[in-house]
Amino acid sequence: MVSQAAKILDGKALAQKIQLSLKEEIQTLQPKIGRPPGLAVLMVGDNPASAVYVRNKEKSCTKVGMASFGRHFPGETSQSELEQVIEELNQDSRVDGILIQLPLPDHLDGIALLHQINPEKDADGLHPTNLGRLVRGEPGLRSCTPAGVMALLEEYNLEVKGKHAVVIGRSILVGKPMGLMLLEENATVTIAHSLTQNLTELTRSADILVAAAGKANLITPEMVKPGAVVIDVGINRIEDESGKARLVGDVDYEGVAEVAQYITPVPGGIGPMTVAMLLSNTVYSYRQKEAGVERQKAGGN
């Protein structure tokens, strides 16, 4: 049993709440649009972890009343074949969101494939157009994991404005958009990475600490400011003494929970929120279809 002072930020509970809200919205919109929202998930190869993630996404789609179009391709599928499939999905009126499940085999250019996706169907929120909208503070599809972090902070009424937020990791998937979203909410943001010299000094000054480095138990109790909010984005598979695999984050959970005021667990913290934001992005695109239907009706009167 963990002896902890920190309150748990329950991503699983909030994700369920968001999914219920999306389900109700879909039930309202579907009669007007004439179909359910649709999410296409492309997976290449036979990565077992990816297969689990894809199944979880498909189950979540079913739960909220969304159609899922899973496309599984052999590991040797070519770049041009996938680009052709993406173009077909861009044109498919049943599809509101397109997701490429990562990682991809080494011979594929994931960035080029991402660029191929219609920005209005970019369920992951990673297309340059959507990242540009984020930089400009304009509405649009947001990167799922950072958006999940922001939703969790909001749910627990945790103040971001004026706080010092330190993000560890600078990936396009999490670190960079995370920094931008915190900045948008008027935090003072520092992004640390593998070449940062004074990591402990920075993390100890953080009111909000987001760990997204992909390194198991990187953040130890002495690196955390007492009373901080600690968000653990890391998902690392390690083996215990018996050789059994288990998932841990980037944060030494048991130790840091005695120092922080709020903390996310792994699993059950940011993982479920990422999926909830993926569904939310797809419904965001679907919602635009209703606006199009209403405009058509107005034009026909």
UniProtKB/Swiss-Prot annotation:
Keywords: Amino-acid biosynthesis, Histidine biosynthesis, Hydrolase, Methionine biosynthesis, Multifunctional enzyme, NADP, One-carbon metabolism, Oxidoreductase, Purine biosynthesis
Pfam families noted in UniProt: THF_DHG_CYH (PF00763), THF_DHG_CYH_C (PF02882)
A cellular-component GO term for this protein: cytosol
E.C. number(s) listed in UniProt: 1.5.1.5, 3.5.4.9
Alphabetical GO biological process terms: L-histidine biosynthetic process; methionine biosynthetic process; purine nucleotide biosynthetic process; tetrahydrofolate interconversion
Gene3D superfamilies given in the database record: Leucine Dehydrogenase, chain A, domain 1, NAD(P)-binding Rossmann-like Domain
Pathway the protein contributes to: One-carbon metabolism; tetrahydrofolate interconversion
PANTHER family reported for this sequence: C-1-TETRAHYDROFOLATE SYNTHASE, CYTOPLASMIC, C-1-TETRAHYDROFOLATE SYNTHASE, CYTOPLASMIC-RELATED
Family as reported in the entry's similarity comment: Belongs to the tetrahydrofolate dehydrogenase/cyclohydrolase family.
Function: Catalyzes the oxidation of 5,10-methylenetetrahydrofolate to 5,10-methenyltetrahydrofolate and then the hydrolysis of 5,10-methenyltetrahydrofolate to 10-formyltetrahydrofolate.
Assembly description: Homodimer.
Protein's name according to its UniProt entry: Bifunctional protein FolD
Native species: Gloeothece citriformis (strain PCC 7424)
